[in-house]
Design a protein with these regions (language model features):
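Phosphate-group recognition and catalysis centered on beta-loop-alpha active-site segments
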Residues: 2-244
Length: 244
């Protein structure tokens, strides 16, 4: 069982986080993709959630349906029954967050990205149910989002579950928000990182969990920067670099 350490000490090797499961191997954000990532030995899984029309949290990356399902419209405007009739890449079902939590069973930690609007409250409500029973603990979860207002709402509702602040440009711009949220980490685009800003973030007490690193040379560069985790579509590639 892998938990997210709240301590900011530098670990020997970065954690491996499967991006949308094992997106490079099996269709993203599906149960088979998550199972594949776990079989590849990840420390954590990253997924995306929206709230559908009937209120359930569904695991899906895009606001619109066309790229992955061939459907039309927005996922937030469909009922769960309608969503369950769709398939990702003609083969895989779109899972609910409940199904993902039940599949993982806290064997690895889960990074839930709040992708859609008004996701903080239902995510908090669902997690509190799981945290009151079974093996799940706050340290087995990370909540992240580019929608910082959702992170603020989540923190008002839940002070126990760790938060990571997502940012696509200068990662130092996320530090004030991370401080106000008592966040555990900043999750930047890996291309925005260098030795200086990585050190500044870590010395301020935050972990650095960059996304999405798939090429061997980029994995090596991130290791040279001593990042705390690597979010990747190919967990096996990171493992291979670590092994060498």
């Amino acid at each position: 069982m892998v938990a997210v350490s709240l301590k900011c000490s530098v670990q020997k090797n970065p954690l491996i986080i499967g991006h949308r499961g094992a997106k490079g191997h099996i269709a993203e954000n599906t149960l088979p993709s998550i199972s594949k990532a776990m079989a590849l030995g990840v420390d954590g899984i990253e997924i995306d959630v929206f709230v559908c029309k009937t209120g359930e949290l569904v695991v899906y990356h895009d606001k619109s349906l066309d790229r992955l399902t061939g459907g039309v419209g927005l996922i937030e405007e469909l009922t769960l029954e309608e969503i369950q009739k769709l398939t990702v890449l003609g083969k895989y079902k779109i899972p609910t967050l409940v199904e993902v939590l039940d599949l993982i069973e806290a064997k690895v930690f889960l990074n839930i990205e709040l992708k859609g609007s008004k996701t903080a409250k239902p995510t908090d409500e669902l997690l509190k149910k799981y945290l009151q029973q079974g093996d799940w603990r706050p340290e087995h979860i990370i909540i992240s989002s580019f929608k910082w207002e959702e992170l603020q709402q989540f923190r008002k509702l839940n002070t126990a579950v760790p938060i990571a602040v997502l940012i696509n440009n200068d990662p130092l711009e996320a530090m004030p928000m991370a401080q106000s949220l008592d966040a555990i980490a900043i999750n930047p685009n890996f291309k925005s990182l260098n030795e200086t800003n990585t050190k500044i973030i870590q010395e301020a007490g935050f972990k650095v969990f960059p996304y999405t690193i798939n090429e061997t040379e980029d994995i090596k560069k991130m290791m040279q920067l001593s990042v705390d985790a690597i979010i990747t579509d190919y967990p096996d590639r990171v493992d291979q670099v670590l092994s060498n």
